[in-house]
Design a protein with these regions (language model features):
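Short, extreme N-terminal segment that most often corresponds to the first beta-strand
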Residues: 1-33
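Charged interaction segments
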Residues: 33-133
Length: 133
């Protein structure tokens, strides 16, 4: 059985200046390019969902870490030409970390959020009586 440590979500947003025909052309070019980048990073179960002037992409990755994310972000950044930009979310499946990146015009910026591990605080919250209504 395959082990996938990371869930990846990408939201691509197209420029409002693109005509409908231009948007469809851009989308048709992005899908195989993004698929190649994700597959090179070990991505599986790649799913695209078109939603008007946005496209959502989801897949799973075998590992979790900057050594995987940074080359992936570099590849995606090369596709962002000002007519499309995206936001990327890497979620480690143990929910210990979230990596978030904004990608536009060939560059990317990231942030990492460390979530607290289950411990005294979360146990205390879990064991509290439910709030009264």
């Amino acid at each position: 059985m395959a082990h996938h440590a990371t869930e990846l979500f990408i939201q691509c947003v197209y420029s409002l200046e693109l005509s409908y025909h231009e948007l469809l052309e851009k989308e048709a070019a992005l899908k195989p390019a993004v698929t190649r980048i994700l597959e090179e990073a070990g991505g599986e179960f790649i799913h695209f969902e078109e939603m008007g002037d946005t496209m959502r992409i989801q897949c799973v990755l075998p590992e979790y870490g900057e050594e995987l994310f940074h080359p992936l972000l570099e590849g995606i950044a090369r596709l962002m030409d000002g007519q499309v930009e995206c936001r990327v979310l890497f979620v480690h499946k143990d929910l210990g970390f979230l990596h978030i990146a904004a990608v536009s015009r060939g560059v990317w910026q990231e942030s990492c959020l460390h979530l607290p591990a289950p411990g005294p605080l979360t146990r205390a919250l879990r064991d509290q009586d439910p709030p009264s209504r």
